[in-house]
């Protein structure tokens, strides 16, 4: 029976076999003191109380009480691996970034795949966007390309992100996933139509992590050695081929093997079947951006490939599993603001918001010195700055070097060649409403030209199967949005909803307790 077990199932057995010639280590406390008895607490007599001096117990229990760190507010369930990025095509005419320096150059990478809305223990096979984040360890510091498996997103303005995520997570009173919340937000923000359509298509449930594409999604800026800049988008297409899970199979796996994606990735790498992705860019000049028919920084839209073809750049290859999940995957922290010279942000509103949000959440989750954690450390660059101290400072704290700038003592100096590309700005400063920036044209193309008839049928079935659990007035708003995309799109979904609603009558409205009313009433009763 053991011969048929996969590497993930046999991890403990393999660990023992790798150490077969070694004697077991001496068991110690966290402070390195040898332990004589790990099976029995120290008591005053066989039936007496525990003694405070049992430091073996207190050392063990105190550490156990603090094992968990805050869960990621999104992308909590994930799998990670390590490998390299190899340049196969020259793009130095676009970017001076050292990661693209010459053909054949290899850069170490770390990758984390994830679902978005589920908790850490949730299933890998739910219908949910997938995170696909890549950390490049370059000589000019880390480059974190924090992407997804879709080239688009639900919203285009970062201020909506907390509310969007709240709507996808659990109801604040029932603590249940709530279709009313999900579809109410989507129906009120029709810019979500493109991503919603992608999500409920066949690609909404990838077959594990190896068989899906990745996208930087945002628009970025590339700058070459002459200071010339272009806008770009990043794509990484799976070399294993796109594979998706049918709804029934995904449901079965969610029950029988909720860690399906994690297991599949670990076993593939352990068996030498290294997954890879071909890396591409799209490029748009500043002049083209000015005359583009829509906002080129809009995260709810794609750049047409016929106008902006994919330019091959290199390969992402994953060939090493993590040695310890917590140390190397749970503590892995991606930050879109980590950009080496040659790669810069665009005015994309969602990207601009993420530049702040990601490092901020890492400082909360992992501490202010999270970049000293080995998996996050830019180990191929020398970190030299004026940041000091803070909880969990694990290095030499930059020794006796000056901790202020400027100074007269040969401490780190700024490098003019690292200056960002300059941008001229003479515009009004205000809160611009971007809600109605053509939310349907590209969705219509997706529905009528990208999908075939069978795929359209499954898309509408998937949407109706989820939307049916929302209230009727929310269903009506959602169907109107789909009808705006294409009459056939809305009509199919409405017909399916009519069947569902005939089987199960809907309440007209839910009543929610006003905030604080229960506690207020209880307080008055006690007066």
Swiss-Prot record:
User: What does the record give under GO molecular function?
Assistant: aminoacylase activity; catalase activity; enzyme binding; heme binding; metal ion binding; NADP binding; oxidoreductase activity, acting on peroxide as acceptor; protein homodimerization activity
Q: Where is this region: Disordered?
A: 1-34
| Main subcellular location | other
Residues bearing Phosphothreonine? 511
**Catalytic residues identified in the record:** 75, 148
Record-listed NADP(+) binding positions: 194, 201, 203, 213, 237, 303, 305-306
Q: What is its EC number?
A: 1.11.1.6
Instruction: Locate the N-acetylserine modifications and list their residues.
Output: 2
Q: Give the residue interval(s) assigned to the motif Microbody targeting signal.
A: 524-527
Residue positions, PTM N6-succinyllysine:
13, 221, 306, 430, 449, 480, 522
GO annotation, cellular component aspect: catalase complex; cytosol; extracellular space; mitochondrion; peroxisomal matrix; peroxisomal membrane; peroxisome
The cofactors it requires, by name, are: heme; NADP(+)
In this chain, heme is annotated as bound at 358
Catalysed reaction per UniProt? 2 H2O2 = O2 + 2 H2O
The entry's family comment says: Belongs to the catalase family.
Name the chain's protein: Catalase
């Amino acid at each position: 029976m053991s011969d048929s077990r996969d590497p993930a199932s046999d991890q403990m057995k393999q660990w023992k076999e790798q150490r077969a010639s070694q004697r077991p280590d001496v068991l110690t406390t966290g402070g390195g003191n040898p332990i004589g008895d790990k099976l029995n607490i120290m008591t005053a007599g066989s039936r007496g109380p525990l003694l405070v001096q049992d430091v073996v117990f207190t050392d063990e229990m105190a550490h156990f009480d603090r094992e968990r760190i805050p869960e990621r507010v999104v992308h909590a369930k994930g799998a990670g691996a390590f490998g390299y990025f190899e340049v196969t095509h020259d793009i130095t005419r676009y970017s001076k970034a050292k990661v693209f320096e010459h053909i054949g150059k290899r850069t170490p990478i770390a990758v984390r795949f994830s679902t978005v809305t589920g908790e850490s223990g949730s299933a890998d096979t739910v219908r949910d966007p997938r995170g696909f984040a890549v950390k490049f360890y370059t000589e000019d510091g880390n480059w974190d390309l924090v992407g997804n498996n879709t080239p688009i997103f639900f919203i285009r303005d970062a201020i909506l992100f907390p509310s969007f995520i709240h709507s996808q997570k659990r109801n604040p009173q029932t603590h249940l996933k709530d279709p009313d919340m999900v579809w109410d937000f989507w129906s009120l923000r029709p810019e979500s139509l493109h991503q919603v359509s992608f999500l409920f298509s066949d690609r909404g449930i990838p077959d594990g992590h190896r068989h899906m594409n990745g996208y930087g999604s945002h628009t970025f800026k590339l700058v070459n050695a002459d200071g010339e800049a272009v806008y770009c988008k990043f794509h990484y297409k799976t070399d294993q081929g796109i594979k998706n899970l049918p709804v029934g199979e995904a449901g079965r796996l969610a029950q029988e093997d909720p860690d399906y994606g994690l297991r599949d990735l670990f076993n593939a790498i352990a068996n030498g079947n290294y997954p890879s992705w071909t890396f591409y860019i799209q490029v748009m000049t500043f002049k083209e951006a000015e005359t583009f028919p829509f906002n080129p920084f809009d995260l709810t839209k794609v750049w047409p490939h016929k106008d902006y073809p994919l330019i091959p750049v290199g390969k992402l290859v994953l060939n090493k599993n993590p040695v310890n999940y917590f140390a190397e995957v749970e503590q892995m922290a991606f930050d879109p603001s980590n950009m080496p010279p040659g790669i810069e942000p665009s005015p994309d509103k969602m990207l601009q918001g993420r530049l702040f949000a990601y490092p901020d959440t890492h400082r909360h989750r992992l501490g202010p010195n999270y970049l000293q954690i080995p998996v996050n450390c830019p180990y191929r660059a020398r970190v030299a700055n004026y940041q000091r101290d803070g909880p969990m400072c694990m290095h030499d704290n930059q020794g006796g070097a000056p901790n202020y700038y400027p100074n007269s003592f040969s401490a780190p100096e700024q490098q003019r060649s690292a200056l960002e590309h300059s941008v001229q700005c003479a515009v009004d400063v205000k809160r611009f409403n971007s809600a109605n920036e053509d939310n349907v044209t590209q969705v219509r193309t997706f529905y009528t030209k990208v999908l075939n008839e069978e795929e359209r049928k499954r898309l509408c079935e998937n949407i109706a199967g989820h939307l049916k659990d929302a209230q009727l007035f929310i269903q009506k708003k959602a169907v109107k949005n789909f009808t705006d995309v294409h009459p056939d799109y809305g009509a199919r979904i409405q017909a399916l909803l009519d069947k569902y609603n005939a089987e199960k009558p809907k309440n007209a409205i839910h009543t929610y307790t006003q905030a604080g009313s229960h506690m207020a009433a209880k307080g008055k009763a006690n007066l």
